[in-house]
Curated annotation (Swiss-Prot):
Keyword Methyltransferase attached: no
Keywords, in A-Z order: Decarboxylase, Lyase, Pyrimidine biosynthesis
Single GO molecular function: orotidine-5'-phosphate decarboxylase activity
Gene Ontology cellular-component terms listed: cytosol
Involved pathway(s): Pyrimidine metabolism; UMP biosynthesis via de novo pathway; UMP from orotate: step 2/2
Lineage: Eukaryota, Fungi, Dikarya, Ascomycota, Pezizomycotina
Record-given protein name: Orotidine 5'-phosphate decarboxylase
Enzyme class: lyase
Amino acid sequence: MSSKSQLTYSARASKHPNALVKKLFEVAEAKKTNVTVSADVTTTKELLDLADRLGPYIAVIKTHIDILSDFSEETITGLKALAEKHNFLIFEDRKFIDIGNTVQKQYHGGTLRISEWAHIINCSILPGEGIVEALAQTASAEDFPYGSERGLLILAEMTSKGSLATGQYTTSSVDYARKYKKFVMGFVSTRHLGEVQSEVSSPSEEEDFVVFTTGVNLSSKGDKLGQQYQTPESAVGRGADFIIAGRGIYAAPDPVEAAKQYQKEGWDAYLKRVGAQ
């Protein structure tokens, strides 16, 4: 595991060249949480209620905005207001996967207006390097109003059974991240990827990509559709900087208490990793 993973969030924030990553680490340190809650609900009311109730205990809220049956201006303004109120970032799990010209329009514009409210987005690199280049171009354009407040995670690995996001796909994900590091903040992956080397790229001394790991659940090992879970401790131990939990929190009998439990477990695992416990 990279030596950067052994550093505290505050230490990494102090030297990180990416302003959004710096802010993310500062949020985590201030709130003592590395939890991302995956709010897979289907109405604006449910989403905003969940964001308000869980906001104090999370660093990031992850949305699938296209599953909302009533997406509107209220969704955008409400979510942005709650992010400000509770000091968390918004991650739209759009998984962009198309040619560059199309994803630029999907990201900045369109019905969902994703660039307007989502600090973080993600993409698959199945279309090739062009998808990362296109999103990076959009974010660096002179007329893009959000500048360094936006960032991209590359979907380098998945936790579903039989996932094809392995091998050369994962290696190329790291290659593209290194090439477009001003916009790419890290990966959605099951482990730390900083030591990946290829004929195209190799790790640099200052490299510090953030790792988000999905499929974190304290009470289940999987579901009927092939999802494979791991605990906060095992995820952080493999290199996760931020753990993503969905049903384990929002479907719990008491989502607030569940969020607090994930917060504690995730934070304890982080302290153990950096040698502060």
